[in-house]
């Protein structure tokens, strides 16, 4: 359940949402086959961008958090509530439809246990208004970039993708992490016969 808004103009676009990302599972622990419990997870986010297909930039933000009151006390003792803040940028730059660079990078600040003690010293306190760092928090990065060349007689591209270990986004159901995609290169040569 949720609500979303979207605006699109010729080059400018913006979107926002708020809603339930995951429903709570609160089965009776005396049940012989209870399902795995889970907190109700709320999320909100927005994105804004400018540009067309050839040259564009978009910024997006996602905030997700578990509602502790959505789970019975007996389950709360076994399962930690979590929260997450993701900030990302994606863009594309091209030159005369011959050379193009695309990139998508994101930073994820993830807390595995919202009830863990707060970090009160160092650089982590600078961001308290945006994300409250706890002793179970971690910040990780993920991204990819691709460079493509298109000429009448050859098409070539090179790509790099990296996801740091323990990268987590509560806005996705599954994320591969600790992943380095080593620069594959694709080349296609066009040959004309007369």
What are these regions (language model features)?
Residues 2-194:
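Signature for the C-terminal beta-barrel architecture of outer-membrane proteins
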């Amino acid at each position: 359940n949720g609500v979303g808004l979207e605006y699109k103009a010729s080059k400018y676009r913006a979107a926002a949402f708020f809603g339930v990302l995951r429903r709570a599972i609160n089965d009776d622990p005396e049940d012989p086959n209870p399902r795995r419990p889970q907190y109700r997870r709320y999320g909100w986010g927005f994105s804004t961008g400018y540009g067309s297909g050839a040259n564009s930039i978009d910024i997006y933000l996602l905030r997700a958090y578990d509602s502790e009151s959505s789970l019975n006390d007996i389950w709360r003792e076994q399962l930690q509530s979590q929260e997450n803040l993701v900030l990302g940028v994606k863009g594309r730059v091209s030159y005369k439809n011959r050379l193009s660079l695309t990139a998508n990078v994101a930073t994820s600040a993830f807390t595995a246990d919202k009830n863990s003690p707060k970090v009160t010293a160092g650089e982590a306190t600078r961001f308290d208004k945006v994300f409250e760092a706890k002793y179970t928090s971690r910040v990780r990065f993920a991204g990819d970039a691709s460079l493509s060349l298109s000429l009448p007689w050859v098409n070539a591209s090179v790509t790099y993708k990296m996801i740091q270990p323990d990268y987590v986004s509560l806005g996705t159901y599954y994320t591969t992490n600790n992943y380095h995609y080593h620069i594959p290169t694709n080349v296609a040569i066009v040959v004309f016969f007369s």
